[in-house]
Amino acid sequence: VKITVPEDFVVGATGALQNPDEVLTDEQINRLEKAKKSKEPVLIVTVDEALENLETKTSRQKTWHFKAENVRDYAFAASRRYIWDAMGVQVGDNTVMAMSYYPNEANPLWGQYSTKAVAHTVDFYSKYTFDYPYPVAISAHIDRMGMEYPMVSFNGYRPEEDGTYSERTKRGLIGVIIHEVGHFWFPMIVNSDERQWTWMDEGLNSFMDDLAGRAWDSELFHPRNNQDYIVRYMRGDKSNIMPIMTNSESIYQFGANAYGKPTVALNILRDTIMGRE
């Protein structure tokens, strides 16, 4: 896929960048190479470079070339406002590049946590399910909420205008990144049909992101995933209780069916019935 944008834009996309020598400076290429072996995020496009891009607003163009294999969808993020950082994650014999794209307004929150949360998710899911098969895993900043595509996730949350942020905002950012990056496995890699069986998308992923979140921070979990919530899901008027095998266009009890009930059931299976061992 080739994406032509103004020369001062930075682009992140599904797939591996094929022409860094045409779209990055020599220094940025060196930073990208350094990031592959770094245990901490390395700035590929710095704050100063992003602010300079924002000022220039050139009319010249350049083309970013990406290559992706075995994907069912595609996405990209492009902006002249983007700061770009990255770090390598060892998955089997491969190095996966965990990366984030965000504006300066998202700092210091994003610079401190976004790429680390991506790397944590890639490592954790690979150990508990199967190795992540793609070369990159991306978190791109948006205004709110989250959405996933192969190799690319869009995630909300940013600090206040003065740069401060609450513990809730920090955990919200980390939680949504873990969840959306987790969707790279379910449904993107396994290729389940989330429109028909939403629980096989959101439910399996919510179970996994609950484990990954607790591994990051013991307080990073959603209360509806606790085992005792099974009572809430089962009691009440039986005529109003919808089965989890309900298509996604039915929004009645959507949150419980797609997210909560499958996660609680899997937690009970893991912790109570089978045991973690």
What is the role of each PLM region?
Residues 181-197, 211, 215-217:
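Catalytic Zn2+-binding segment of zinc metalloproteases
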